[in-house]
Amino acid sequence: MEQNGLTAVIVAGHGSGFSRGYIRYFADVHMWEGDSLILIPLDGEPMHVQVTYASASMPDEMWIKDYRRAPEPQKEIVNAMKEKGLTKGKVGIAGLQKRITVGGYETIKNAFSNVAFVNADRMVDQIRGIKSDLELEQLRSLWEMSQRAMDRFVEVIGPGITQREAASEAARVFRGAGSFTDLTLIEEGRFKGLPRDVPLACDDMVSFHLEICGESGHWSEINVVCAYQEPSELERKLINSEFRALQEVRAKARPGTMLKDLEDTFLQVIVDDGWKLGDPEWHYSFHGQGMDSIERPYFSPMIEGNEDAPLQEGMVFSYHPHRPTIPEVRRVPKIFDGFVITKDGAETLTKDWDFLWRIMK
């Protein structure tokens, strides 16, 4: 803050998978819904305020002692800034781009004619991007639990069991481990979406995608493919190509490497194996992951939406690059991983995980 000439930072959060992480990071409070704001002065104690219905989980020992509830948190921020004499200078807002509400920002800005409010998103994202040893321990535990949930899905699926019944068995694992925020997607045939009360056919391929916000507030993203027909020659070739690309990307992912370099490494392996590349699709090949399911930095093969950056030791990424190929492959590999950047390359957060298809008998 001092280096950036800030007298304070206002941290904004909202109860959703992409925007509650700021609040959890600074206050260890898991938001269910609603809005939350934290005032962190350069000198003095912080203040945290939430709408009354926002809290889902509070720490036994509050990290921020000055904790308030208010139907309009921004008004309490105004009060606290006046109490602390923060009526001039430069104040950063972390979450200005996507987290703070328009009304909240306008109320705070209009209350202080002598304060210059500036975007502090990148400053806070850079701090959060490097995970502590404790966070890495929590992430490894979360990924281990995520794998157990996926294994349970594989154990129970079969012809006739409904999508919801199968997904619920996986949910028993992560609910029992303290996770209450998730995304579960099932893909079979032409259907892809939230589980429905529809029997699985289990005659071709079933894909199960799981994103979990764990007890510590961190996220994981993992996928499993259950194949009821052996891979064709082309499918097996692409599976092998993408698995080799995963290994090459891990080796390349050292401090100083750009995310675009990882994308180029992935694509080069595919091309070297004799594939021609189709048109890119809009998705993130790599994105930071921590207390938000998607965090800076991130890379997309499309120009729009990129936040490319050099890798730093301790960063954590979700890995899921892909590119349509020529010739086209009907069933694609769907390889997902999570890894932490080390000086020796990427260390996977999975443990003895089978990234290849599960061939169901």
Stretches found by the model and what they are:
Residues 1-361:
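Active-site neighborhoods and metal-handling regions in enzymes and metal-associated proteins
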